[in-house]
């Protein structure tokens, strides 16, 4: 990567909620910014360009397709995100997308792949989000984005309204899941049939997060260096540290494990795009829970950009000599 790519970040807000049923997740971007995101990235010596928030008009009469809800609204929003992410990547910046619900990963990854078609993905989540429109129990598109992206699944994914623009950009060997603990039967079948590398929380417990990250990095970029896209659903973390999200699942990654994942991805020097998804301040039962979730998401983001738990100092800092 160029020096500018390593030290320059483009922040893109995606305040969108129609991939699932719970309102409030569209407020994620503004809350994360208010927590000091831009200033803290600048303290890490990044040149930051804030591209602002995308606008997502709600389409009237967006009838379900079979049981898939809001297909045209979600498809249009994801396409807008894809175009915006491509613009950020063409500028040479690392792209940070603030969601919004996880259906938008169809857009973030497709947009990234337009510029870096050899990318790979680390997907941190309690859920696999790889249901097809046919296997999805709920019909919510935030549980389906990966199915649109995987080439080996395209004979299983029907043409649904709003998604004709999507071209699959990943093979099954290009993605690794970390943190799974609520996987639907159809998703489990897909993961096992395609041999997609995934680490459930049982695997994390058994191997430790250090081994999980060693294996993940070796699998994705050990033989060939290529851009890494981190798509981070905040519900990958345990509800004790990130309660304000739409579908929390007990028994998740600890704060320390989340930090270790992001630190190790930063240390590769290959992290090219980051999604922070499903932060929903309205789902906190108290103001403290909402603030805790926002601050946790902020710290995960900053760790992606080099904030180390051991401390940090500006390159210009000097301890003055006594006169």
Curated annotation (Swiss-Prot):
Catalytic function, reaction form: L-arginine + H2O = urea + L-ornithine
Binding site for Mn(2+) 2: 125, 127, 233, 235
PROSITE patterns assigned to the protein according to its UniProt record, in alphabetical order: ARGINASE_1, ARGINASE_2
GO terms of biological process kind: arginine catabolic process to ornithine; urea cycle
Cofactor note: Binds 2 manganese ions per subunit.
A GO cellular component annotation in the UniProt record: nucleus
Gene3D superfamilies, per the entry: Ureohydrolase domain
Named cofactor requirement(s): Mn(2+)
Transmembrane parts of this sequence: none
Highest taxon, organism lineage: Eukaryota
Keyword presence, Hydrolase: yes
CDD domains: Arginase
EC number per UniProt: 3.5.3.1
Disulfide bonds: none
GO molecular function, a single term: arginase activity
Keywords associated with the record: Arginine metabolism, Hydrolase, Manganese, Metal-binding, Urea cycle
Binding-site residues for substrate, renumbered to this chain: 127-131, 138-140, 184, 247, 278
Enzyme class: hydrolase
Binding site for Mn(2+) 1: 102, 125, 129, 233
Subunit structure, as described in the record: Homotrimer.
Database matches in PANTHER family: ARGINASE, ARGINASE-1
Name of the featured protein: Arginase, hepatic
Organism (species): Aquarana catesbeiana
């Amino acid at each position: 990567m160029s020096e500018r790519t390593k030290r320059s970040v483009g922040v893109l807000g995606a305040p969108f909620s129609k991939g699932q049923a719970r309102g409030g997740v569209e407020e994620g971007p503004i809350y994360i910014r208010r927590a000091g995101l831009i200033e803290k990235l600048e303290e890490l010596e990044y040149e930051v360009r804030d591209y602002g928030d995308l606008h997502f008009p709600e389409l009237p009469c967006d009838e379900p397709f079979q049981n898939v809800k809001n297909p045209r609204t979600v498809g249009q929003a994801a396409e807008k995100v894809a175009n915006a992410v491509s613009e950020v990547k063409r500028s040479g910046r690392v792209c940070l997308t603030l969601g919004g619900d996880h259906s938008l990963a169809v857009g973030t990854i497709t947009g990234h792949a337009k510029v870096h078609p050899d990318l790979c993905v680390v997907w941190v989540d309690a859920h696999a989000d790889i249901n097809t429109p046919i296997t999805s129990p709920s019909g919510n598109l935030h549980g389906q984005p990966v199915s649109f992206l995987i080439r080996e699944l395209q004979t299983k994914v029907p043409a649904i309204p709003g998604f004709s623009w999507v071209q699959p950009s990943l093979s099954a060997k290009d993605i690794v899941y970390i943190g799974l603990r609520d996987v639907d039967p159809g998703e489990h079948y897909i993961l096992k049939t395609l041999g997609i590398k995934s680490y459930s929380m049982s695997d994390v417990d058994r191997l430790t997060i250090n081994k999980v990250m060693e294996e993940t990095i070796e699998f994705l970029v050990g033989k060939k260096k290529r851009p890494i896209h981190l798509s981070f659903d905040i519900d990958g973390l345990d509800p004790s540290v990130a309660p304000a999200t739409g579908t929390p699942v007990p028994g998740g990654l600890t704060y320390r494990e989340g930090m270790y994942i992001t630190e190790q991805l930063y240390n590769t020097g290959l992290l090219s795009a980051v999604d922070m998804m499903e932060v929903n301040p309205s789902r906190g039962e108290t103001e403290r829970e909402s603030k805790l979730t926002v601050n946790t998401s902020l710290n995960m983001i900053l760790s992606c950009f080099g904030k180390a738990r051991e401390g940090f100092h500006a390159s210009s800092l000097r301890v003055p000599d006594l006169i």
